[in-house]
Amino acid sequence: MKVHIDEEADALYLRLDESKIIESEEVYPGIVLDFNEQNQLVGIEVLQLSSRINLTTKNIKVEISQS
């Protein structure tokens, strides 16, 4: 898993898998999900990031559960 924050673009990209992205879907304004050939989620893009979280925060806790 890779996380990239682009402050200039005001966006965050979370890459869950390195497989080829076949389809993207905006599921909520500014939230885009990327899917591979098996329709599995492989990436999450969050636009207008600074309006959603405080970018000056030094630590951000994220809980990830696998099903």
Placement of each model-derived feature along the sequence:
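Small, basic N-terminal interaction modules of short regulatory proteins
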Residues: M1-S67
